[in-house]
Regions:
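N-terminal Rossmann-like or analogous alpha/beta NTP/dinucleotide-binding catalytic cores
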Residues: 1-85, 172-173, 177-190, 242-249
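Noncatalytic linker/hinge segments flanking ATPase motor cores
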Residues: 49-56, 111, 198-199, 235-245, ...
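Residues that form generic nucleotide/phosphate-binding pockets
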Residues: 58, 81, 95, 99, ...
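A short, terminal or domain-edge coil/loop segment
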Residues: 62-75, 127-131, 135, 245-266
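Active-site cores that bind ATP or allylic diphosphates and position pyrophosphate for catalysis
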Residues: 75-220, 238, 271-278
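Conserved catalytic-core subdomain
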Residues: 207-278
Length: 278
């Protein structure tokens, strides 16, 4: 909506590098669902699984510049569980940072944050000025996994640069990940987009709605009602009659009436307690 409101282009990218989590037909279902709800993207769909050479080239540049090191630490060795989402990774203590033998046998590659790295700062469209001491608050992070797969942060940075992305709007749960991506952009000589991290919808206890028992699937039969509800949650104050209007009519109202300033400074919106939907 932000891109359309500003007269820009909206791009669709399918993050399908992790083949174990990509069920057959899932990408097609994603696209079909977006269409049913009136989302229209510009250009061709970008599949990360088709762009591996770009990622390998970027990784080689980081390795040759000396900004990475091998890490053979297992999750059990570090007493951590595997993170299932970007932004939830634990802080790595630097165990293999000065261990040349780590490159012997299977190993991951980590981006080495400089010891004198200053705070990474940027102005977020919704959260205002954000700063992070990446070395202490994030730690050296994986750019290539132990199984050879390119990690999320590196793939995202490479794609944003290759596609000319100049604005990224996403959830506030990824706010703490952004400084790491900025470090990679600087290492690769890539531009940094404008970022905006929207508030999350959460349960009264703080859990993300998408991960809770009250989350309901998208239903094309009630697409208008669900779109209207999301706009209301996002403080856009859509006219009540739009809840029964065609999907296109909702978008025709929403795009010119987008008011991002109503969301400034908010990390989450806790929904009222109530029974789980039937």
């Amino acid at each position: 909506m932000s891109a359309r409101h500003g007269g820009g282009r909206w791009l669709l990218r399918i993050d399908d590098l992790d083949r174990d989590r990509c069920l057959p037909g899932l990408a097609d279902e994603f696209q079909a669902t977006l269409r049913r709800f009136g989302f229209e993207w510009d250009g061709n769909v970008c599949f990360q699984s088709h762009r591996k050479e770009l990622y390998r080239s970027a990784l080689a540049a980081i390795v040759s510049s000396g900004q990475s090191y091998a890490c053979r630490c297992s999750r059990s060795k570090l007493s951590i569980t595997q993170a299932t989402e970007p932004g939830t990774e634990p802080i790595y203590p630097g165990t293999c940072r000065r261990d040349p033998s780590a490159a012997q046998g299977p190993h991951a590659l980590r981006f080495a944050i400089a010891a004198d790295q200053p705070f990474v700062e940027f102005d977020d469209a919704f959260q205002g000025r954000y700063r992070q001491d990446c070395r202490r608050e994030a730690g050296d992070f994986v750019v290539r996994r132990r199984d050879g797969q390119i990690a999320y942060h590196l793939a995202t940075v490479v794609d944003d640069a290759a596609q000319g992305v100049n604005e990224v709007i996403r959830g506030a749960d990824l706010l703490s990940s952004t400084p790491r991506q900025i470090l990679l952009q600087r290492a690769l000589g890539s531009p940094t987009p404008r970022y905006g991290h929207l508030m999350l919808l959460t349960e009264p206890d703080g859990r993300k709605l998408a991960k809770s028992r009250r989350a309901v699937p998208l239903d094309a039969a009630v697409a208008s009602t669900q779109l209207w509800q999301v706009l209301a949650w996002l403080e856009q104050e859509p006219p009540r009659e739009l809840a029964a209007a065609p999907v296109k009519s909702i978008w025709d109202w929403a795009i010119p009436n987008w008011r991002p300033e109503r969301l400034e400074g908010r990390r989450e919106r806790r929904l009222e307690a109530g029974p789980a939907p039937a």
